[in-house]
Structures are given as C-alpha cells and as structure tokens.
Amino acid sequence: MNSTQDTIYAQACEHISDFQFDDRVAGVFSDMIRRSVPGYGQIINTLGDFADKCVTPNSKIYDLGCSLGAATLSVRRRIEGRGCEIIAVDNSESMIERCKQNLSAYVSETPVDLICADIRDIEIQDASMVILNFTMQFLAPEDRQTLIAKIYQGLKPGGILVLSEKLVFEDEPVQHLLDELHLDFKRANGYSELEISQKRSSLEHVMKPDTLPQHQQRLKAQGFSHFSVWFQCFNFASMVAIK
C-alpha cells in the first residue's frame, strides 16, 4: 500500500481550510497516518488476529470508514475459506478508488463490497465483526450513539466491534503530558513545527474526540456488557466490545 510522502502542510498557508479526505490526502494517507498515529501498524495487524478468533462462517464483516483498505486487507488474509463477505465503506471517492486498487493487488476468495457512502446510512446485518478505525471521531457527536446502536443490533451474538479512536482526557495534566508525547512522536517522524501546527488547525473543527468514559458509557447504553481497551499509546486507543 505505497503512497508518497505527506507534505500537505509543509508550506505556510495563508488560509487553512478544514481537513478533508480528498484526493490530495488519499494520495499520501498511508504515510500520513503511519507518521501521525502511534501504534497504527500494531492495531491494523491485530485486527486480523481478532478476525481469526471471532469471525464466524458465512457472516459479514463491516469496515466503516475503510480509507485505503488496510483494515480490510488485514482481516481478509485471516478469514479465507469461511464463506464470509466484507463490506468496506467510505464517503471519500478518492479513498474508495485507491482502496479498490489496493485490494485488487491481492488474490482472495473472500469478496469485498466497496461502497462509497456515509457510514450512517449503511444497514448492518449478520455481522460477526464491525471495525471503526479512527472514524467515529469525525462524525457529529449527536450521531455517534445512533451508530453504535445500529452496530449492536446488526451484530450476531458473540460478534465484536473494534473501535479505535483518539482520546481526550478530563485530567488536564494527563491531557497535556500525552499531547506533548504525541507531538514528540510526530517530530521524530519528520514533521516540522509548521506542519504540526497547520494540520492541527485544519482538524480543529472536523475531529471531535471523546473521553474514554464517554465511549464506555455509549457502549453500555446500547447493550454491550463486555468491553475493554486492548491497546493504548499516548492519546490513541483501541477498544473491543463483544455482543
């Protein structure tokens, strides 16, 4: 899943527009997310492990906000021969087009239905696994509860939701420390102060992270009684919830 280096914010911008998953971002997304999200590779690899353990024969897997297909590829490698179908959804045509190319590079008997749509409009049924990988934080906060409810209803008993998100913290010293560590991570991966500042400004109005208790309360309210954080690095975490 090759991409060119992310230099989108390397030059000073007079006007910084809101972040969009457009063609420019899609072209550098693999590099961008690897250099911006600590533990991203570990999360992607472990999605395949979750699928191996939890995906049941003749069921469906939903990758909601599939971007370039990294999660779908990780899962598909581990479920061959189970008669399953993966439904991969993204509302960015540029992401879907590149995802299609990435998926076609690997031979597989597991079909992937690639859909360019808003994940809030997708019906979920017969699912043994649903993936929300750094996706929900871009939805309007008032729509998140409804989405989790729809996922819960569409999961088969024993099915899982894997939810990865950036977190915010009510404890201000903790928030400051983890934020600083994340910034150091980006600096160590070659991002300049200008790039970091401009990217943060572009995300300010479009990415609204929740606290961990907010995620937990939302999962519990919609019927999940078994859930836990399985991975965390700084202010990025991944949770698993079992129906």
From Swiss-Prot:
Identify the keywords attached in UniProt to this record, alphabetized. Answer: S-adenosyl-L-methionine, Transferase
- UniProt binding sites for S-adenosyl-L-methionine: 40, 65-67, 90-91, 118-119, 133, 200
Q: Which cysteines are joined by disulfide bonds?
A: none
GO MF, one example:
carboxyl- or carbamoyltransferase activity
Xref: InterPro entries: CmoA (IPR005271), Methyltransf_25 (IPR041698), SAM-dependent_MTases_sf (IPR029063)
GO BP terms, alphabetized: tRNA wobble uridine modification
Superkingdom of the organism of origin:
Bacteria
Catalysis: reaction(s): prephenate + S-adenosyl-L-methionine = carboxy-S-adenosyl-L-methionine + 3-phenylpyruvate + H2O
According to its UniProt record, the EC number is: 2.1.3.-
Describe its partners and assembly state. Answer: Homodimer.
What function is annotated for this protein?
A: Catalyzes the conversion of S-adenosyl-L-methionine (SAM) to carboxy-S-adenosyl-L-methionine (Cx-SAM).
Q: Which family does it belong to?
A: Belongs to the class I-like SAM-binding methyltransferase superfamily. Cx-SAM synthase family.
Q: What name is this protein filed under? A: Carboxy-S-adenosyl-L-methionine synthase
